[in-house]
């Protein structure tokens, strides 16, 4: 099965399990590293996830994936929090994390550039609003290739 199909199937199977546990499915990754395959599922909830949350989701997903067997190779299943530099994947993330510092990369230039680091203001319609270098700017959500929270000390 192609990588994209694997990710799509895993997300479809994982989402109800994660939601049933009162958690958010942040992201799913399938990667080959050092000759080994890894399926990583990132979960979160307000206040952060506990090891018990990860264990619960891991056990349920492991059983479901064993039944479906979508991945022909042997792989390691990892379930964890997305970390303090979590990716911002959904429009709602920019509302939830308003006031936080983020790094954003766009598919094509916005106001002449593709990389931005600034404070998230929120969403305005379909645009992410950020305070970048003392100036408020709007970045179309559909133009965002990747975005992550930045660690502040």
From Swiss-Prot:
| Keyword annotations from UniProtKB, A to Z | Cytoplasm, Ribosome biogenesis
Q: Which domain of life is it from?
A: Bacteria
Cellular component, GO annotation:
cytosol
**Which PANTHER family does the entry mention?**
RIBOSOME MATURATION FACTOR RIMP
* The protein's name: Ribosome maturation factor RimP
Q: Where in the cell is it found?
A: Cytoplasm
What function does this protein fulfil? Required for maturation of 30S ribosomal subunits.
Question: Which terms does the UniProt entry file under GO BP?
Answer: ribosomal small subunit assembly; translation
Q: What's the short name of a Pfam family annotated to this entry? A: DUF150_C
Among InterPro entries, the record links this protein to: Ribosome_maturation_RimP, RimP_C, RimP_C_sf, RimP_N, RimP_N_sf
**Organism classification:** Bacteria, Bacillati, Bacillota, Clostridia, Eubacteriales
């Amino acid at each position: 099965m192609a990588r994209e199909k694997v990710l799509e199937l895993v997300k479809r199977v994982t989402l109800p399990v994660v939601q049933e546990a009162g958690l958010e499915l942040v992201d799913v990754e399938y990667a080959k590293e050092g000759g080994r395959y890894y399926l990583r599922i990132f979960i979160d909830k307000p206040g952060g996830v506990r090891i018990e949350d990860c264990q619960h989701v891991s056990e349920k997903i492991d059983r479901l994936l064993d039944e479906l067997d979508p991945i022909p190779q042997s792989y390691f299943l990892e379930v964890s929090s997305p970390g303090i530099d979590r990716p911002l994947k959904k429009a709602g993330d920019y509302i939830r994390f308003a006031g936080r510092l983020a790094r954003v990369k766009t598919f094509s230039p916005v106001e002449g550039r593709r990389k931005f680091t600034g404070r998230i203001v929120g969403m305005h319609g379909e645009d992410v609003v950020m305070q970048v270098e003392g100036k408020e700017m709007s970045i179309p959500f559909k133009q965002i290739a990747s975005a992550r929270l930045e660690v502040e000390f």
